[in-house]
Amino acid sequence: SITSVEQIISGLTLAYLVKKNRPEIHITIGGSVFTKLVDRLEQDGSHLFNFVDSFIVHEGETPLLRLVEQLRGDGDLRKVPNLIYRQDGEVMVNRPFAKEELNSLPTPDFDGLPLDLYLSPDRVLPVMGSRGCYWEKCAFCSIPFDHMEFHVRYAENVVNDFKTLQEKYNCNHFF
């Protein structure tokens, strides 16, 4: 995921190096930066597809799962929501963009991640209570450019996420 402009050069450089050394690996990039650039990717972003195979824009949990299923199956990328890819030299955009049902998403799973190596005095994990912004009027903010409707996760699901993450990962700090 590339979620800020400061990550673009390093993220695309990493994609370039992986593709150069292992061209058979399918590289997908997601994140809010490319969500804001959907029109640019569609119109003149074809050069990025020299080292990135696809972009997942807007919300990505279900699209990423569908992409993995298609790459393991028949490879029909038209079946993957929120995906931008190049096929036969043409940039394809799978619209309409799908919105996640936040209350159907499971508690995040951080198993296998080296949480003790993160540079923080205490373990801190993310918990999602909502996406988008209910107001969308701040002149300095880029959230409205994501074109995402504000939607929330039920309070009982968020509380369950806190409890589960606290017990499973011995975490008392969340953002």
Predicted regions and their residues:
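A short, sequence-level motif marking secondary-structure junctions
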Residues: 96-102
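A generic structural signal for short, non-catalytic loop/turn and secondary-structure boundary residues
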Residues: 76-78, 98, 120-122
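Radical SAM [4Fe-4S] cluster-binding motif and immediate context
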Residues: 103-175
